[in-house]
Amino acid sequence: EMVDSLILTGSSGLFEESMGNSFPRRGDKDYIRTKTEEVFYDPKVATDELVDKVFAIANNRISVLKLLGYAKSAIRHNMGEDIPNIDKEVCLIWGAEDKVTPPHVAEEFHKLLPKSELNWIPLCGHAAMWEQPKRFSEIVLEFLKK
């Protein structure tokens, strides 16, 4: 009742799997660089400065525990049964080349959310608001004007 509409981008909640041994590998900066680059369509977006920040987070015990908690929660509570009950307008914004939360997840969200619109950003990975901020903002503003 307090929410008029939603904007979701690269969202989790469906199809989460165990992280296995993929995260976090503390102290391995090359691994952190590779994983950071995978977030973007253009790996050059993963600058040395950004990789340093991600590396610091991956080596901060409190941050890692929080991230693992979020990941475990997403694995335990699949939202597939709850999502169709959302009766609000929803703007889905997805990077067309998202490897973290692939396009088929966007399609499933769109199918399950009765009042959703799905917006693709081409040549864009998981962090659409970062990699394509102008187009991302245009989509958000168009949605908010409705």
Where are these regions (language model features)?
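Hydrophobic "lid"/C-terminal helical patch
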Residues: K35, A71, F109, F136, ...
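Conserved alpha/beta-hydrolase catalytic His-Asp/Glu region
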Residues: R26-K88
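Short alpha-helix in the alpha/beta-hydrolase fold that links the catalytic acid
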Residues: K88, P102-K111
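Active-site acidic short loop of glycosyltransferases
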Residues: V3-D4, D87-K88, P114-K115, K146
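Short beta-strand/loop motif that positions the catalytic acidic residue
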Residues: I86, L92-W94, D98
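Residue-level signal for the nucleotide or nucleotide-sugar donor/cofactor binding architecture
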Residues: I62, T101-H104, E131
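Flexible "cap/lid" loop of the alpha/beta hydrolase fold
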Residues: M2-R33
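Catalytic active-site module of serine/aspartate enzymes centered on a nucleophile-bearing elbow/loop
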Residues: S116-K146
